[in-house]
């Protein structure tokens, strides 16, 4: 065999070995992991559940100079529109399974509505939920309650602040609402209606304990009956603040900045300051509906605002 022929055969043999490796390149999956996280608050198991994300024009929504908003977001490696988490929180007290907020369901498009799938991935079923506590009746918090006119959580009692129920479930308010606001009323009514008809909706009329270890506190401003929920066990505390904050990159440094979704901007700002001052002073764990998933962390007073310290990823012990 001549030398050139030996060289050609060797090259062909080498290519035969390499070729399968090249052809076996795996396709990209391009999907996110199931959106749930787990931690213990004393003896209570808390599972943040992500309903998905939605892109929002925060430079237009936040009540400050748009250029300032864009610059601040940029410094935090964010852009506009800003991808914003929509989080709910599942609380297992050992005797009750409680869900705080339900995500958007089908009311906000295909990037949301993942709560039930993620709840199941977390090891639970909708029929196991005993109680649902709504922070407020905006569509991205109540939309997951119903699907095609039927209750998604067949065995659950739903609770929300009375002022929110009186406002959002009022036909008179729907009738006189501006055209661009009617959808919020209609979404709330459609979402709550199966539970109202079944006698499974109960308004929260005053601050107090709803089940052992979970307390409701009125924090109006974002909506008339916006409510926060405090989980306590063995000296540990988690405060679920709902929509007291939307954009940590902006509103932690400047807590006076409000958002266009607030029904009463002055009251919303005051509620944020009150609860955040307390959380920073006491070192309380905070959970937010629109803080980047899992939406959990601590507040440290810094200048005229706060520093957000996200929770450290930990094993459940």
Q: Each PLM stretch: what is its role?
A:
Residues 26, 113, 120-124, 128, ...:
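Metallo-beta-lactamase
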Residues 85-88, 94, 109-159:
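Active-site metal-binding motif and surrounding structural segment of the metallo-beta-lactamase
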